[in-house]
Amino acid sequence: MKKLLVALLLIVSSVLSFGAQRMQVEKMVMNGDLFYVQGEQKPYSGEIEKKYPNGKTLGLATIKAGKLEGKVYEYYENGKVKSEGNYVNGKAEGVEKNYYKSGKLESEVPFKNAKREGVAKYYSENGILVAEVPYKNDVTSGLGKQYNEKTGKLEYEVTLANGVRNGSSKNYYPSGKLLSEVNYKNDIQDGPAKFYYENGKLQAEGTYKNGEVDGVATTYDENGKILQQVTYKNGKEVK
């Protein structure tokens, strides 16, 4: 009986050891959207790994019935995580995180059904939020923001639609005061444009049409007095 138990334990140990092995990605092939081990007919289930030339792990993922399932990791050669994401039935789902070599968070990008959905956030290596990019159905859409990488203060914000600037865009002074406000249509300046002194007083204003100044452009001094007025047509001064 004792010998039988020992034999059974050895068999179980061997099976567990085999099951824990990671299949190297070089031995995998894709047929359609499914992963297979070369020469096998059944979609693969288990862990897959990719290594650096020195043998250290570069990437690690889990496959279920031929599709990515669960956490997917990419590593720097120093062993620290470079990126991590989550998959459900072969599609990215949830927040993908990317890291600097130091281990500090570099970005957070939300996914839904393999498409970017929501606000992606980007950070400096010092941990300061430097940009927020909104996505809808994998296309930039919404209010995008850029921050100063040293102070974290808002520098620029823009309305995005269909992947390009559509609507108001604003630039700010380091103090946080509004510097300019310009309107875009399909990524081309179109509509009113205003520029301000840091004290909030209007410095200049005009109108754009299809990317060209069109109409009366006016500049002011810091007391609100008109300094100059020039009329434009299709970007050219009308005299």
Each predicted region: which residue ranges?
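Positively charged n-region of N-terminal signal peptides that target proteins for export
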Residues: 1-4
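Bacterial N-terminal signal peptides
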Residues: 7-15
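Glycine/tyrosine- and acidic-biased, solvent-exposed loop/turn segments at the edges of beta-strands
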Residues: 15-239
